Amino acid sequence: MKKVVPLFYLGILGVFVMVSCQQTASDAGKTTVAGDSAATKKDPLPSWNDPLKKEIIDYVSKVTTEGTPDFVPVKDRIATFDNDGTLWAEIPLVQELFAYYRVKQIVTANPALAKKQPFLAVVTKDKAYFEKGGEKALIQLVGATHTGMTEESFEKDAKEFFASAVYPGRNVPISKIVYQPQLELLSYLRASGFTTYIVTGGTIELVRAISDSLYGIPKNQVVGTTFKYVYVDSNRSIMREPAIDLLCDKAGKPVGIQMHIGQKPIFSAGNERSGGDIEMCKFCQSNHYPSFQLIVNHNDSLREYYYQEKDSASLKAAVQNKWHIISMKDDWKTIFPR
């Protein structure tokens, strides 16, 4: 099978001069996750509009009502959410910002590396280097910025990045580019006995660093793109090697779900941009229990961004398979936390 490089690295040169990392207020790395007691409120999804809001609530009520044909036991109430473009904004992708952060960090510590590839191409914004080098050059960059360190070191760097990073174009902390309606949905599902997972094309460790603080999802409930690991006995740690073990995108998402979760979800949410969530939604729909699929349509240029896939693959798949499409413009009363 032909290897594919995750899309979040393709635009790194475009954001090289946009990213600003500065120290923000002490709560910059935090966001307000709606409490899981939200389901006990009269309105568990206050940022959602009908009819989609009602359809979600009706589904949850159906599968959680004991004694009915559609009842799903708590152990089987698995919900999987994509991250980029589904739980937070993706223009630019946070993974791109982190890759730049790491390049800057590395060349500051060792200036001589700024004259060597792939760092030279990033520093000089040499787009042709990556276009000509293709997959090999991109994997080289990924390996150089995301591996060669212990898991503890990587997590420390990731948390420092999230504590200081400012999102380009909006001048807000990363915690402020999460989607408020989705925070409510996550809390509502958990309060209804669901276990919520993130299934992301992004690197698993980067998302694990903030999944709990941003979404109330513990790190052991994050599935994502992974590098190969090796155990180092001398310091009893796990080192990351510059080779991708699982690309958790498209057909890789069901594989990741099976590897980490071990069963099909009954609820899944993704978004349109690259067709990366189609297979996850299909996998979810094949569950023998009643299931529910959501695809976020980025059609609100005023409050977020407007972009579509060239072939509209995700939206076409949603229509064909009778999944639910979230119109950001029409279905969400608000988009970002206030």
Short names for language-model regions:
Residues 1-9:
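Bacterial N-terminal signal peptides that target proteins for export
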Residues 77-92, 281:
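Asp-based phosphoryl-transfer active-site loop
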